[in-house]
From Swiss-Prot:
Residues 83-93 have a biased composition (Basic and acidic residues). Residues 73-93 are annotated as: Disordered. InterPro entries: Ribosomal_uS19 (IPR002222), Ribosomal_uS19_bac-type (IPR005732), Ribosomal_uS19_CS (IPR020934), Ribosomal_uS19_SF (IPR023575). The gene is rpsS. One of its GO terms (molecular function) is structural constituent of ribosome. Protein S19 forms a complex with S13 that binds strongly to the 16S ribosomal RNA. PANTHER family: RIBOSOMAL PROTEIN S19P FAMILY MEMBER (PTHR11880), SMALL RIBOSOMAL SUBUNIT PROTEIN US19M (PTHR11880:SF8). HAMAP family: Ribosomal_uS19. GO terms for biological process: ribosomal small subunit assembly; translation. It comes from Streptomyces avermitilis (strain ATCC 31267 / DSM 46492 / JCM 5070 / NBRC 14893 / NCIMB 12804 / NRRL 8165 / MA-4680). This is Small ribosomal subunit protein uS19. GO terms for cellular component: cytoplasm; small ribosomal subunit.
Length: 93
């Protein structure tokens, strides 16, 4: 179920402070965060945010189409290595 509109979007305080500080300074440095639950707001447009996936930080460049989504949606946590080919010769041995 989506979040209520009267509550507004959730963004961690430390993340919004970093974004606002960079907007005032006019810099576009990479912002490292562990907050996958934070929603992308219009103030983040044009910034690169490194989102933690449990192992490393994956850089995510925020575009206009991402507004309203959560940061964790753009940082996959699971790696798919593919299915093993069905090799009949190796099964006989």
């Amino acid at each position: 179920m989506p979040r209520s509109l009267k509550k507004g979007p959730f963004v961690d305080d430390h993340l919004i402070k970093k974004v606002d500080a960079q907007n005032e300074a006019g810099s576009k440095n990479v912002i490292k965060t562990w907050s996958r639950r934070s929603m992308i707001i219009p103030a983040m447009l044009g910034h690169t945010i490194a989102v933690h996936n449990g192992k490393t930080h994956i850089p995510v460049f925020v575009t206009e189409s991402m507004v309203g989504h959560k940061l964790g949606e753009f940082s996959p946590t699971r790696t798919f290595r593919g299915h093993v080919k069905d090799d009949r010769k190796s099964k006989r041995r």
